[in-house]
């Protein structure tokens, strides 16, 4: 909708008379905040990890604090780091006023430990699963997956990163000093009112998109880094928005890992797609000592920002994700980026069957069926491969619990090099072909879910239930 003459005069008067536009119409502040780095919570033998879901206060803009949800007293949650071979006792405590269920996307555990409808945590109650970590290094994330309420619960702040490390990742010559040269970046979009308070009005179709870009809860932050390689663990925790990331001076991003672990070798890219729910690891060469910014597309012009005073906008006010500012001298010895990240090529098995799935909003649900907790949509066998062909009439991300998959083709073409590792989340704009490997078992009482990662669509029923039966014993 274009601005009427009267609306334009009103907006111009606001801008000139007050000396500045309200928060929603302002461009990003010239005074950048420092990147908030979530505290690190590590597993220790015999000691539980506590994640308390509670109300908190957080300043998204300046010093104006807004009421939010979060974990352990802050917006979003701590970064949890565990190790392959650990048995992690996790204690979720719900100190909110409504039921919540939590899950860890990317963690390979049985359906009994995945969360969801069968593991609702009532207000004032706890859930204390013991999680056997038996998988290679991966960047996972924990978040609310409350049935029919996942979108507002994640938007409110119930999310955080969950890192799995193993012997390979510990020996890898990649930056590994958390908060020094190894940073988690949780990217979201929000809509803030003139007081810096998040607004959430889900649309009748599609998913919610905001006009304000946040990283770890901050707008356009900066971080000081040492000269040399810097490692960024990227998570798109937005409800629906996909990002195309690039560096401001044209230098490459080196992609080293996707959702479920390392790529076979680093991949240099000028632009990198990050879909909702997707995780990627990149490293950046800061050895020359030049400041650089990560950006995500084109920002709104002044007319778009003025229009945002009168109607919700889906155009980002600023597309600045993060500015990296190198400090200090270049170390005498710096590691080169390894030529190989995995000792062996990814081994593919034989596909035993094919399935097709239609994701839509015109025809709600998946294959025209709305999620039903009493219905099993897919039954598979642990240790087998299947070919899944996913179609979408509206671009969206798609996630499967309890599996790892390889992207074989996208709209008939081979997958991009940065998408040729193990994944659990994929962007679907047309048709994608996946080869799905079933790692873990589930049951009708504790099924895995597959769903649209456009969270409002998942809440409206674009989800299905997967039961993976144990492999037969010989």
Swiss-Prot record:
Q: Which family does it belong to?
A: Belongs to the FtsP family.
Keywords, comma-separated and alphabetical: Cell cycle, Cell division, Periplasm, Signal
**Per its UniProt record, what Gene3D superfamilies does this chain match?**
Cupredoxins - blue copper proteins
Task: Enumerate the subcellular locations listed in this protein's record, separating them with semicolons.
Answer: Periplasm
Under InterPro entries, the record lists:
Cu-oxidase-like_N, Cu-oxidase_C, Cu-oxidase_fam, Cupredoxin, FtsP, TAT_signal
Enumerate the GO terms in the molecular function aspect. copper ion binding; oxidoreductase activity
Quote any Pfam family the record assigns.
Cu-oxidase_3
Q: Residue span of the signal peptide, if any?
A: 1-27
| Chief localisation class | periplasm
Q: What is this protein called?
A: Cell division protein FtsP
Q: Which GO terms describe its biological process?
A: FtsZ-dependent cytokinesis
Lineage, please?
Answer: Bacteria, Pseudomonadati, Pseudomonadota, Gammaproteobacteria, Enterobacterales
Task performed by this protein? Cell division protein that is required for growth during stress conditions. May be involved in protecting or stabilizing the divisomal assembly under conditions of stress.
Q: List the disulfide bonds.
A: none
Protein's organism: Yersinia pestis
Query: Which Gene Ontology CC terms are recorded?
Result: cell division site; outer membrane-bounded periplasmic space
List each copy of the Plastocyanin-like domain by range.
229-288
Annotated PROSITE patterns: TAT (PS51318)
PTM remark: Predicted to be exported by the Tat system. The position of the signal peptide cleavage has not been experimentally proven.
